[in-house]
């Protein structure tokens, strides 16, 4: 729902898990959102970041670390192609 200025006024905006593409429900209290900062060649933060959302199911299975690693490798390949 939007107000007259076009701003979103919803209290809950559903997200999807970046690793499994599952819908993260409002009752999934184990889900997390990670912002991973981008570094330059000297290892300094550039001010940019990439956001990944992980559902509680992935975290409960112990696949969060490998899922984030896989997503980050995919992101690096996409960045090199552009």
Curated annotation (Swiss-Prot):
This is Small ribosomal subunit protein eS21y. The keyword Acetylation applies. It comes from the Eukaryota. Coiled coil: none annotated. Belongs to the eukaryotic ribosomal protein eS21 family. The modification N-acetylmethionine is found at residue 1. The gene is RPS21C. PANTHER family: 40S RIBOSOMAL PROTEIN S21 (PTHR10442). One of its GO terms (cellular component) is cytosolic small ribosomal subunit. GO terms for biological process: translation. GO terms for molecular function: structural constituent of ribosome. It comes from Arabidopsis thaliana. Keywords: Acetylation, Ribonucleoprotein, Ribosomal protein. The keyword Magnesium does not apply.
């Amino acid at each position: 729902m939007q107000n007259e200025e076009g701003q979103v006024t919803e209290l809950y905006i559903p997200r999807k898990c970046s690793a499994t593409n599952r819908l993260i429900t409002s009752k999934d209290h184990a889900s997390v959102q990670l912002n991973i900062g981008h570094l330059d060649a000297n290892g300094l933060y550039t001010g940019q970041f990439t956001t990944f959302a992980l559902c509680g199911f992935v975290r409960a299975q112990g696949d969060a670390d490998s899922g984030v690693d896989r997503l980050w490798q995919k992101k690096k390949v996409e960045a090199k192609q552009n």
